[in-house]
Amino acid sequence: KRLENHMKYYDLHLVLEGEEEFELCSTEELENISEKNYDEDVFFGDKEDGLIKGVLRPGYFLVTFVDEAHKLGISKPDGKHVKKIVYKIPVGGKNE
């Protein structure tokens, strides 16, 4: 699974049940960057070392900004089903 990034929306990931690992890095650190898909607001890239890593649990949240590439759903540490909500927040506070 590759790191993804968005141009028009911040992501707010809120875990309701289970646990989920994530990885983050600056988009400036990405290699092998895909073409930007503006219609779907996404592009992908790779980075092997120096990633920020963590685990989301119920009550925790993660906000990823437009300059932060992210990968979630890497593994589920407790092996259980993950239930979460992802909110898309328009950059600048309004839809473009």
Regions found by a protein language model. Name each.
Residues 61-63, 79-96:
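A short hydrophobic beta-strand segment most commonly corresponding to one strand
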Residues 21-22, 71, 94-95:
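Short, acidic Gly/Pro/Ser/Thr-rich loop/turn segments
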Residues 29, 68-69, 92-94:
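Short, solvent-exposed loop/turn segments at secondary-structure junctions
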Residues 8-10, 14-20, 24, 29, ...:
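Glycine- and acidic-residue-biased ligand/ion/polar-headgroup-sensing regions
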Residues 1-10, 28-33, 49-50, 56-58, ...:
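A short beta-loop-beta micro-motif enriched in histidine and acidic residues
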Residues 74-78:
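Short proline/glycine-enriched turn/loop segments at secondary-structure junctions
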Residues 55-73:
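Conserved metal-binding segment of the jelly-roll/cupin
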